[in-house]
């Protein structure tokens, strides 16, 4: 490589020749504490284990360990810095590829758990025909399966106000059709303004 410089990467941790310390606090494969050792010793332990050494805390001057690093590279292992601000820096012998995979997987799991529940609305009328009803029902099923709440708004117009019972029957039908997927969070006891509103929440998975 031109000038003998190491290409900078977007890795979150320093590994091998990127580690800037003469001594490191070393952690083994099972998390066991191996004490404070020279970087050369740490790399040799990583090589013996056939894994990577990850630096966890880098805060020292750079050092030349060409021989040890070449040996580690030949064995296909790394020394990975985990805690760059500790004194001395904390490094770990590990399979760095697996470490990054598990970290990414954990981050994705956290994002799933942090899903923001939305309330999605579908509007009905007392005179909603069967075809339109089934289309709206499929949308409600999709909302609930995605983990969102469903707001069912039944609107009355003109003379429909004289047939509020029909509106209540529509809401009860929706509730019954979705009973396997949802629980009723709120159900109207009377009309408010010109509408009735029912809110369904997805059932918690067993």
UniProtKB/Swiss-Prot annotation:
This protein's name = Translation initiation factor IF-3
* GO CC annotations, alphabetized: cytosol; membrane
Question: Which subcellular locations apply to this protein?
Answer: Cytoplasm
What is the organism field in this record? Shigella flexneri
Q: Which InterPro entries does the record associate with it?
A: T_IF-3_C_sf, T_IF-3_N_sf, Translation_initiation_fac3_CS, Translation_initiation_fac_3, Translation_initiation_fac_3_C, Translation_initiation_fac_3_N
- UniProt lists the gene as infC
Alphabetized UniProt keyword annotations: Cytoplasm, Initiation factor, Protein biosynthesis
Task: Report the family membership.
Answer: Belongs to the IF-3 family.
The job of this chain, per UniProt, is described as: IF-3 binds to the 30S ribosomal subunit and shifts the equilibrium between 70S ribosomes and their 50S and 30S subunits in favor of the free subunits, thus enhancing the availability of 30S subunits on which protein synthesis initiation begins.
Q: What is the lineage of its organism?
A: Bacteria, Pseudomonadati, Pseudomonadota, Gammaproteobacteria, Enterobacterales
Name the NCBIfam families on file: infC (TIGR00168)
Which is a Pfam family this sequence falls into? IF3_N
Q: Which GO terms describe its biological process?
A: ribosome disassembly
Highest taxon of the lineage: Bacteria
Q: How is this protein organized at the quaternary level?
A: Monomer.
- GO terms assigned for molecular function: ribosome binding; translation initiation factor activity
Subcellular location, principal: cytoplasm
